[in-house]
């Protein structure tokens, strides 16, 4: 599997640039042995809210939106210190949304905005959403358009290779990276 080969190259210092994969799995194969691999059936197409090409450099940070939303604002948060230390680099946030509904996602993004998570953001990247639950006929795009981050005037990229729907890019939090 190419994503596993890329991972091994990254941790051994033999790969510094990653590229999006061609296909991803929308639905996992039944796990019998645990060695089934990916069920690659869907074409990968990264999208932006404004449909423009993006080139952005900054310090990347993020993770599972479900988990970050729980930690945000607690004594384990640390975003104020991180923002202060790396504000000159600018931040590229990435999020993997595993189980949050679209409506919950909108509320969580508002909470993170109010806690200054996006104060020095240069871009925000979302992987493929694990849950597409909605009570109001949202799509990923309309969910992000209706959220507070759409008013930040920064690139918002979604449907990327960062999610519970593999394969996924290998991200090392805190490094300077360029997304293009």
Where are these regions (language model features)?
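Intrinsically disordered, low-complexity coil segments
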Residues: 50-54, 84-87, 149-150
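ATP/nucleoside-binding phosphotransfer catalytic cores, i.e., glycine-rich phosphate-binding loops
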Residues: 123-180
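Conserved anion/nucleotide-ligand pocket segment
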Residues: 1-66
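Predominant activation on well-ordered alpha-helical scaffold segments within soluble catalytic domains
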Residues: 8, 65-73, 106-109, 145
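Fold-independent oxyanion-binding glycine-rich loops
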Residues: 23-26, 63-64, 71, 96-98, ...
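Internal helical hairpin/lid segments
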Residues: 76-137
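Generic secondary-structure signature for well-ordered alpha-helical cores
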Residues: 8-21, 70-77, 114, 153
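Short gly/pro-enriched beta-turn/loop segments at secondary-structure junctions
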Residues: 54-55, 60-65, 71-74, 86-90, ...
